[in-house]
Amino acid sequence: MEKSVSGPNIFNMKLLLLLLILTISFCYAFNNETLKVRLNVPFFKFFSKNGHHVVDEEIPKITIPEIRLPFSSSIGHGVVRTDDLKIEKFSSPKIDFKLSKTGINWWTTGGAIKLSGRWHAKFTEVITIRDKGWLNAYATGIQMNISAAAYQLDGQPQVKIGDCTVQIQKLDVEIGGSVLSWLVNLFETPFSKLVKKVINAQACSAAKGILIEEANRFLHSLPSHVDVGANFYVDYFLTQNPHATSEFTEFDLAADIVYGKSLCHPINIGNWTDASSTPGMLTSWISVSIPNCLIHSAHQNQLVKLLVSKDIPVVEPYLRTSCGFLGLCIGKFFKKLRNEYPNNHVDLFFHTYSTPYFVMSEKEGVMLNMSLAVDLFINPYAKTKQNILARLVVDTFSTVEPFLNHTRIHGRLQNSTITARVDFSNIGDIPKAFLSAFSSILSMTAREAVRSVLGVGIPIPSYDNVTLADSSTIEVFDQFLRANIDFEYK
């Protein structure tokens, strides 16, 4: 007897599989542990409660394979098969779960589905007779129990199914539309039983064999260099198999964020704390190495740069090489500028002087150390950038408040301590009076450069219409952040 696998239990299985894949998709990693993600009980409650949103979108997309039944009688033999069998109506089941040391157990209750399609039959006695009609299958009270666990293979997440049982409280199959009732009578009863058997008995093995294999192939093929916008990428690698308890499932990972094809080798600095008394749906520990990789690659690729020129009206007078007796301009401090470049302007080109870095402290908060080179050129910079006049260095020490915005962790600039010094000069000695007179321009531009670094942010994985809730919080500890994340469905 040849038969194909189908039925509403496969659809429930696909829901559970989608939820498990969604769970694992929150895990990013690379080489050395720099990130820990803990999925707490409220996380699974949320996605179990809102799983119908995923199901309602995904179930109608499922292609239902053919069901085929050979049959025979004393006068001949034949075969009947389904055609264009698809989902006409679907009622989402209720999904519950329980965490354990071995993984997670999911079960569904309720739920109903109606399948509609066509059947085609042929029967051979002396000649071959063909007939066709319609088929409806109604399944209600669908119950499925399944255990699943996640593990890593080559640093990528994988899913394995443990126990799986299915029970359908009621399943009815209707066959009609034939003009040869005697032919239908030959196969109706065994064909209906086969449809029921396929739906009721084969769902788990099909899910284990087909769905899980496909899911694991997909998960294993996920890129380890993930675009998160503006040519920044997350590199990730699962360092070990997940750890499960009755309260949470936890993933240890290593991750970095880099620009383009830059490389970074983050290290685990400090020890993670326990989750707070109100951990939220998801708790994540983020090493200072991750944002430091981000700004390291930004420095390597010269992304932090600002040009202050005469095109900015508020600073144009100060950038002149010539000005009156009572005027204040850069030329007043440098005789060489007045004599060799009269009636011109100087451009100030700001860029990172050395690799910036973050420091995180439970007592002091988040601090960003960044030194900016300020190169002086005769305007326009685009034509004279090979002839640098002088270089200043502006050292900034900024306190930063981390905050959550949409699906990213950003930093808000609080206070900055800014000092300027001379690196070299080709236009004579640079007097302290010049540094004092131009401190406002240097400070204003340096703060803008700091804000540009903080604006990139660290991405938090999200899914479809699931967003961060206002109850989400972030805390600072010695050399890492701890984020307690709640989600909401919009």
From Swiss-Prot:
Gene3D superfamilies xrefs: Bactericidal permeability-increasing protein, domain 1, Bactericidal permeability-increasing protein, domain 2
UniProt keyword list: Disulfide bond, Glycoprotein, Signal
The organism's place on the tree of life at top rank: Eukaryota
Signal peptide (UniProt feature, chain positions): 1-29
Record has Zinc-finger as a keyword: no
Entry annotated with the keyword Glycoprotein: yes
Positions of disulphide bridges: C164-C204
Pfam families given in the database record: LBP_BPI_CETP, LBP_BPI_CETP_C
Gene Ontology terms, MF aspect: lipid binding
Glycosylation, residue list: N32, N145, N271, N369, N405, N415, N465
Listed InterPro entries: Bactericidal_perm-incr_a/b_dom (IPR017943), BPI/LBP/Plunc (IPR032942), Lipid-bd_serum_glycop_C (IPR001124), Lipid-bd_serum_glycop_N (IPR017942)
Cellular component terms (Gene Ontology): extracellular space
Family the UniProt entry places it in: Belongs to the BPI/LBP/Plunc superfamily. BPI/LBP family.
Descriptive protein name: Uncharacterized protein T19C3.5
Source organism (scientific name): Caenorhabditis elegans
